[in-house]
Amino acid sequence: MVKNSFSSVISQEEKKENGGSVEFQVVSFTNKIRRLTSHLELHKKDYLSQRGLRKILGKRQRLLSYLSKKNKMRYKELINQLDIRESKTQ
């Protein structure tokens, strides 16, 4: 499996004190998504991993939707830092 060199946006101190925040969860899901994507490039017929990827994508999308409704500025900063696209449904 190819390791993805994605540096975390949130520092180690913030992880320890605020591990349940929406931003931390989105960063965590983004790391998992990138890792699974690189895995699926090598193993195209791994359907169980494809299903897991779709589930994680849905969870991240729901969290981003929640964050955009609650605090638009934090949402914009987070998607810019993670270099992910903005949702079309907003």
From Swiss-Prot:
Entry keyword set: Chloroplast, Plastid, Ribonucleoprotein, Ribosomal protein
Pfam families named among the record's database cross-references: Ribosomal_S15
One GO cellular component, as annotated: ribosome
PROSITE patterns with a match to the protein in the record: RIBOSOMAL_S15
Keyword match Chloroplast: yes
Family matches, as SMART domains: Ribosomal_S15 (SM01387)
InterPro entries assigned: Ribosomal_uS15, Ribosomal_uS15_bac-type, uS15_NS1_RNA-bd_sf
One Gene Ontology term from the biological process aspect of the record: translation
Region (Disordered): 1-20
Complex formation: Part of the 30S ribosomal subunit.
NCBIfam families from the UniProt entry: S15_bact
Name of this protein: Small ribosomal subunit protein uS15c
Source organism per UniProt: Cucumis sativus
